[in-house]
């Protein structure tokens, strides 16, 4: 017998309301109603675990109730010695290492997932979980018809348990339907491999395109063009100077030739002077 504590229990809730609230989670051996809280006794430990996991925080008569396992009372000697674990039992690993595990651990989803298709709608997650337990395998989590109709997802603690359950359930006839099982174990290394590839490719994207890169030959040609530019300027200057010299030389040659000028008036006067003397008496 396993007892479960009910917190925030409405005062208007009756025994039938509580029994209806826990319907589908196994048989209840006793229901205890108090002022604002209560207790429920389950016959099976696994049914109590599932009820606490799924119904904690759900509404009962319009109020969200709290479901948890009551803590074990610690005696005076245990409290003095420090051996009161309050529901936690010590387990020992190889090598003598001690580890504390909660006896009432909640079902958890793991990466070892088994997908069961073609499941009858008459089978709930509790039914498929109990069916796997009858096969000698303990699942950690199960859900049915939640994501897809006629489909269940069951998780296990190890891949060996998953393989064992898959071999036993594959093709089994449940309520006129043959089950189809698929191993959907999540591999962490495979899920991370694309990220590593994308990271290795990222530096190439950040680099400049090859067209913008300059080869050593282009650098040399640029240097040659730059070094040749002063020569071109000097050639232009030399040509302009030669042209200016040729023009100036032509002008000087024209100025050296004596211009055709008329005789000066003095010479004309000298030629006319004897004529005037002979005519005088």
Swiss-Prot record:
Chief place of localization: nucleus
Pfam families: RRM_1
Gene3D superfamilies membership: 3.30.70.330
Listed SMART domains: RRM
PANTHER family named in the record: RNA RECOGNITION MOTIF RRM DOMAIN CONTAINING PROTEIN (PTHR23003), SERINE-ARGININE PROTEIN 55 (PTHR23003:SF51)
Modifications made to the protein after synthesis: Extensively phosphorylated on serine residues in the RS domain.
Bias-annotated ranges (Basic residues): 191-215, 245-254
Protein's recorded name: Probable splicing factor, arginine/serine-rich 2
Biological source species: Caenorhabditis elegans
PROSITE patterns: RRM (PS50102)
Signal peptide as annotated in the record: none
Gene Ontology cellular component terms for the protein in this record: nuclear speck; nucleus
Sequence ranges assigned to domain RRM in this UniProt record: 2-72, 112-186
Domain of life: Eukaryota
Known function: Plays a functionally redundant role in spermatogenesis and growth rate control. Required for the development of somatic gonad structures and for progression from larval stage to adulthood.
UniProt keyword terms in alphabetical order: Developmental protein, Differentiation, Gonadal differentiation, Growth regulation, mRNA processing, mRNA splicing, Nucleus, Phosphoprotein, Repeat, RNA-binding, Spermatogenesis
CDD domains: RRM1_SRSF4_like, RRM2_SRSF1_4_like
One annotated GO biological process: gonad development
InterPro entries: Nucleotide-bd_a/b_plait_sf (IPR012677), RBD_domain_sf (IPR035979), RRM_dom (IPR000504), RRT5_SRSF_SR (IPR050374)
Biased composition (Basic and acidic residues): 78-97, 168-190, 216-225
Gene name as annotated: rsp-2
Family per record: Belongs to the splicing factor SR family.
Cell compartment(s), UniProt: Nucleus
Region (Disordered): 78-100, 168-281
Gene Ontology molecular functions: RNA binding
Record's miscellaneous remark: RNA-mediated interference (RNAi) of rsp-1 and rsp-2 result in reduced brood sizes and abnormal egg-laying behavior, and the presence of unusual vacuolated structures in some of the secondary spermatocytes, spermatids and spermatozoa. Rsp-2/rsp-6 RNAi caused severe abnormalities in somatic gonad structures and in some cases animals were arrested or dead at the larval stage.
């Amino acid at each position: 017998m396993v007892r479960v504590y009910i917190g925030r229990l409405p005062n208007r809730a009756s025994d039938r309301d509580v029994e209806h609230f826990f319907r589908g989670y196994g048989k209840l051996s006793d229901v205890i109603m108090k002022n604002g809280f209560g207790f429920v006794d389950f016959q099976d430990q696994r049914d109590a675990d599932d009820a606490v996991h799924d119904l904690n925080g759900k509404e009962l008569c319009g109020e969200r109730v709290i479901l948890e396992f009551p803590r074990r009372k610690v005696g005076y000697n245990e409290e003095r010695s420090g051996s009161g674990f309050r529901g936690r039992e010590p387990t020992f690993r190889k090598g003598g290492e001690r580890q504390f595990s909660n006896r009432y651990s909640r079902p958890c989803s793991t990466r070892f997932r088994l997908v069961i298709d073609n499941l009858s709608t008459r089978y709930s997650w509790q039914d498929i979980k109990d069916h796997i337990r009858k096969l000698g395998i303990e699942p950690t989590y199960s859900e049915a018809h939640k994501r897809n109709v006629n489909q269940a997802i069951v998780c296990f603690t190890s891949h060996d348990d998953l393989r064992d359950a898959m071999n036993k359930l594959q093709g089994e006839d449940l309520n006129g339907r043959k089950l189809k099982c698929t191993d959907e174990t999540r591999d962490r290394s495979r899920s991370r491999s694309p990220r590593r590839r994308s990271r290795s490719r990222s530096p190439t994207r950040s680099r400049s395109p090859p067209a913008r890169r300059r080869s050593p030959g282009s650098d040399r040609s640029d240097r040659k063009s730059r070094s040749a530019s002063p020569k071109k300027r000097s050639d232009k200057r030399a040509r302009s100077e030669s042209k200016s010299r040729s023009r100036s030389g032509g002008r000087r040659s024209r100025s050296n030739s004596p211009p055709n000028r008329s005789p000066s008036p003095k010479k004309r006067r000298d030629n006319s002077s004897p004529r005037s003397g002979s005519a005088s008496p």
